[in-house]
Structure formats: C-alpha cells, structure tokens
C-alpha cells in the first residue's frame, strides 16, 4: 500500500508542477483596479474561510497561457475559450475546498503536524521530484516553464502532504476479511489463471438488427464468414474477414457485451442472434480460444488482499470526506465564475 500511495502522491505532485503559476498583474489605472476587484471576488466559503477568484486563478496560469496560444490575446471574446476556463476554475475550486475541509478535520483529529514537519515532508517530496530529472538544469528549466520558483512550488506541495497524512489516519484501521477475498476470487477467476485466457474473434458489424439476422441466416446455409464480412461489414476489419486478433478475457478495450458474447462461443461457432453495442449490431465468430487453469487461491490471496485493501481504504476515505463536507457549511458561488 505504501508504494501505491507514493505513486499516487507523485501523480498529484506532477500535476501541481504543470498547473501552479501566480498570475502577474497587467494593465494600469482603471483596468488594474477592475482586475484587482475581480481577483478579490469571493467564489466559495468553507467554514469561515473565504476563497477568492484570484486564489483560484493563481493555480491556472499555465491554462491561461495555453488558451492564449490557441485563441490569441483576445481569448475573452471567445465563448469556447471562456467555457474551458470556467470548467478549469471549478475543478481547481473543488480541490481547494477539499483541501480546507481535510486540513480542518485533520486538525480536529490531532494528526496535522507542526508547520516545520509539513515543510520537511514537502521538501522530501520536492527532492523526489528533483530525482526524476537527469540534471539540475533540466529541473530548473521545468520550474521556469511552469512559471514557478522552487519556493512557490514548495508551497503548492503542502496541501497534498497534509491530505496524505490525514488519509493515512482515516484508513489506518481498514481491514479485509477472508470472506471478501474468497468472494472476489470466485468472481474474478479470469484474472487469476496460469496464463491469460484469451479469445480470437471475428465479427461482421452492420447498422441494423435485421441486417445481422440476414447474415446469420446466410451463415446457417453454409456461406463463408470471411466473405460475408468483406461483403457486408462496415468497419475496417471487413478486409481481413472481420478478424480482431487475440483479446484477453480481462481486456477493457472492448464493449463488455461484445466480449462476453465472444468468450461464450466455442471455437468455430458464431452467435445465433445479433449482438447489440453502441457501434451497431454484430455477428461474432470464434476463430480460436485459449483457456488455462485457475491458480489456487493461496497463490493469489495476498494480491487480492492488497487490491481489496486499496478499494476499502478508498471507499472509507470518500465516505469520511463526504461526511466532513456536509458539516463544512460549504457555499459555492458558481455564478461569480465566468
């Protein structure tokens, strides 16, 4: 679990590297005052703490640079650009609200360390990030590209450090029972075979159910599947007889209904009724399949336990933070974000 948490935290920190840049003030006179007023606009309240639009935008400068590059300096006149900025603002605001909620409740739990300790842990995370660069020059170049100094970036790491500390305390007593392990094993045996089970299907994709039924009728009369695929198929596989090559049973790259239908077939057989997916209607043939014995539960018990522990911990975390949010008297003023 510790390795996975570190990986997760590193992903958070990598995201921060790409999105933290304090906006510089532009313009002068009345324009400057208008911008200052906009930046002070309160867009959320959490407990008694206020979040301003300026604080939100301080995390979005790289987004603004991307928008300017795509839409030009007059991006504010572009509806699509402003809608994108609004969605990014709302996403950052959600993160900032949660940071406050988590820190507040971490303080109540007595698990938030001193500022010195938070600084130390943030520095450790920064050092880990530095190690991902081959040279210090590359690291400094990345900071410059993100528009941050090392000091300002360090500040952006602290909420993630605090969240991780609170997370570990919230989930520390989460367990996995033997019953949960057995149930998961029984329901996911295709994930624990000696080698990955796989099927090699071919298909003929058509637009209507009736077209698929007509193809099945022709197959029943002995016509060749590959020739029918070339004649009737509507996707790129028609030119190779509808062959989709090998697909593992656990693949997430295919529609679940389609894959289950393919797996259910014996080698050389085809579906007797059309298979409906978001793409249309399929007639599927099993060209070949390979199935292997399931490994004994004792061999995979620890791996299953780790998988379930992560799931249970995540569920506990979501449940806890959701409850905290309800008690935080959160007020979002989305109409002030445009």
Please name every model-derived segment.
Residues 51, 80, 84-106, 117, ...:
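Solvent-exposed aromatic/hydrophobic patches embedded in short alpha-helical segments
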Residues 38-46, 51, 87, 113, ...:
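Extracytoplasmic
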Residues 140-146, 151-154, 167-199, 230-231:
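Acidic/polar surface patches and capping/hinge elements
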Residues 38-66, 100-106, 159-170, 184-185, ...:
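FKBP-type peptidyl-prolyl cis-trans isomerase
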Residues 1-12:
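Bacterial Sec-dependent N-terminal signal peptides
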Residues 78-79, 83, 215-257, 287-288, ...:
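Peptidyl-prolyl cis-trans isomerase
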Residues 24-27:
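C-terminal motif of bacterial Sec signal peptides marking the signal peptidase cleavage site
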Residues 33-152:
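N-terminal targeting/tethering segments
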């Amino acid at each position: 679990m510790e390795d996975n948490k570190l990986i997760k935290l590193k992903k958070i920190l990598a995201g921060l590297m790409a999105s933290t840049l304090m906006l510089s003030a532009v313009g002068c006179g009345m324009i400057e005052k208008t911008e200052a007023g906009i930046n002070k606009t309160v867009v959320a309240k959490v407990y008694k703490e206020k979040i301003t639009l300026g604080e939100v935008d301080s995390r979005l400068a790289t987004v603004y640079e991307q928008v300017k590059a795509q839409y030009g300096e007059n991006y504010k006149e572009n509806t699509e650009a402003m809608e994108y900025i609004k969605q990014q603002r709302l996403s950052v605001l959600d993160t900032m609200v949660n940071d406050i909620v988590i820190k507040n409740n971490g303080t109540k739990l007595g698990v938030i360390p001193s500022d010195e300790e938070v600084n130390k842990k943030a520095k450790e995370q920064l050092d880990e990030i530095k190690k991902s660069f081959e040279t210090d020059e590359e690291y400094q170049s990345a900071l410059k590209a993100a528009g941050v100094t090392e000091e300002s970036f360090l500040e952006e790491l602290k909420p993630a450090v605090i969240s991780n500390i609170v997370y570990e305390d919230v989930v520390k007593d989460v367990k996995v029972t033997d019953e949960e392990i057995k149930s998961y094993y029984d329901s996911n045996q295709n994930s624990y075979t000696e080698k990955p089970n796989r099927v090699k299907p071919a298909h003929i994709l058509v637009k209507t159910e009736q077209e698929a039924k007509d193809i099945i009728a022709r197959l029943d009369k002995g016509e060749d599947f590959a020739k029918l695929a070339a004649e009737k198929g509507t996707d790129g596989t028609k030119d190779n007889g509808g062959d989709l090559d090998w697909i593992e049973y656990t693949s997430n790259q295919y529609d679940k209904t389609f894959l289950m239908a393919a797996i259910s077939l014996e080698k050389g057989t085809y579906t007797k009724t059309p298979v409906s997916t978001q793409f249309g209607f399929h007639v599927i043939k099993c060209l070949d399949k390979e199935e292997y014995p399931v490994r004994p539960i004792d061999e995979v018990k620890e791996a299953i336990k780790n998988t379930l522990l992560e799931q249970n911990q995540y569920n506990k975390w979501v449940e806890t933070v959701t409850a905290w949010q309800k008690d935080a008297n959160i007020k979002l003023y989305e109409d002030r974000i445009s």
